[in-house]
């Protein structure tokens, strides 16, 4: 295999990986809206004393 063929194969793999990763990135944006929102699980837990997030779980009960 020549250098030109190996470089072409490398570019093909890089471009394929980039194209495949775009749809998964845009699909996850909608699912992360709650995590980006101020009224997420950690924010609500401060008002009612419950938290299921590992960062505040040692200070509050999960309530599940």
From Swiss-Prot:
Disordered: annotated segments: 23-46
Task: Indicate the residues removed as propeptide on maturation.
Answer: 22-47
Q: Is Signal given among the entry's keywords?
A: yes
- The region annotated as signal peptide is 1-21
User: GO molecular function terms here?
Assistant: acetylcholine receptor inhibitor activity; ion channel regulator activity; toxin activity
Q: List the disulfide bonds.
A: 51-56, 52-62
Per the record, its GO cellular-component terms are:
extracellular region; host cell postsynaptic membrane
User: Where does the record place Basic and acidic residues bias?
Assistant: 28-44
Cysteine amide PTM positions read 62
What keywords tag this UniProt record? Acetylcholine receptor inhibiting toxin, Amidation, Cleavage on pair of basic residues, Disulfide bond, Ion channel impairing toxin, Neurotoxin, Postsynaptic neurotoxin, Secreted, Signal, Toxin
Output the InterPro entries linked to this UniProt entry. Conotoxin_a-typ (IPR009958), Conotoxin_a-typ_CS (IPR018072)
Tissue expression: Expressed by the venom duct.
**Record's superkingdom?**
Eukaryota
Q: Where in the cell is it found?
A: Secreted
Give the main location: secreted
Q: What is known of its domains?
A: The cysteine framework is I (CC-C-C). Alpha3/5 pattern.
Function comment: Alpha-conotoxins act on postsynaptic membranes, they bind to the nicotinic acetylcholine receptors (nAChR) and thus inhibit them.
Q: In which family does this protein belong, per the annotation?
A: Belongs to the conotoxin A superfamily.
Q: What is this protein called?
A: Alpha-conotoxin-like Ac1.1b
Q: Which organism is it from?
A: Conus achatinus (Little frog cone)
């Amino acid at each position: 295999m020549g250098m030109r063929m190996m470089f072409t194969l490398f570019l093909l793999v890089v471009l394929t990986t980039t194209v495949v990763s775009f749809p998964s990135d845009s699909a996850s944006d909608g699912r992360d809206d709650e995590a980006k929102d101020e009224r997420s699980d950690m924010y609500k837990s401060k008002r009612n004393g419950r938290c299921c997030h590992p960062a505040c779980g040692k200070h509050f009960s999960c309530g599940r």
